[in-house]
């Protein structure tokens, strides 16, 4: 993705990845022997009007049906899922809107979207219920007294802002 205003190129944006999850309804916990699953591109479609342009990526992803009985790895049996990614550029708006459409039939996993920025930043901004929250990128230092190790993922609803004076 290239920012035509700055010339900055973002490589590796919108990477769909799926990982196992053996945590509870509150906490993500990856299985000891996890496998990362990525989708395959099936087709692309574009729609263009005077106001916006949308690229639709139709993907398929083969997800393990669940974790194994021991819950330390993912099952070898998989289900194929359709997944659509819509990337929309609106005229005069300096951002790309990304929507992911996916109907889940698998258990014990987490589907995510990664956006590499290549930027060196100390914090990021996230939308909360009533405010824009600023959080440090680096995880806090831990020791043996921590019952639960911190994770880099944080709650957000509709956007994340990772930027500095170079772009974002």
Language-model features: where?
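Polysaccharide-binding surfaces and accessory modules of carbohydrate-active proteins
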Residues: 115-168
């Amino acid at each position: 993705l290239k920012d035509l205003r700055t010339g900055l190129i973002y490589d590796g944006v919108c990477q769909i990845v799926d990982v196992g999850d053996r945590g509870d309804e509150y906490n993500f916990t990856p299985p000891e022997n996890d496998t990362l699953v990525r989708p395959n591109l099936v087709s692309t479609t574009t729609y263009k009007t005077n106001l916006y342009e949308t690229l639709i990526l139709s993907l398929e992803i083969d997800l393990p049906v669940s974790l194994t009985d021991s819950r330390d790895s993912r099952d070898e049996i998989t289900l194929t899922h359709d997944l659509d990614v819509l990337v929309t550029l609106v005229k005069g708006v300096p951002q790309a809107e990304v929507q992911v459409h996916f109907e889940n039939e698998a258990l014990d996993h987490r589907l995510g979207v990664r956006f590499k920025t290549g930027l060196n930043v100390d914090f990021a901004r996230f939308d909360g219920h009533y405010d824009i929250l600023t959080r440090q990128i680096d995880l806090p230092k831990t020791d043996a007294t921590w019952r639960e190790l911190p994770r880099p993922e944080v709650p957000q609803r509709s956007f994340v802002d990772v930027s500095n004076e170079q772009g974002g």
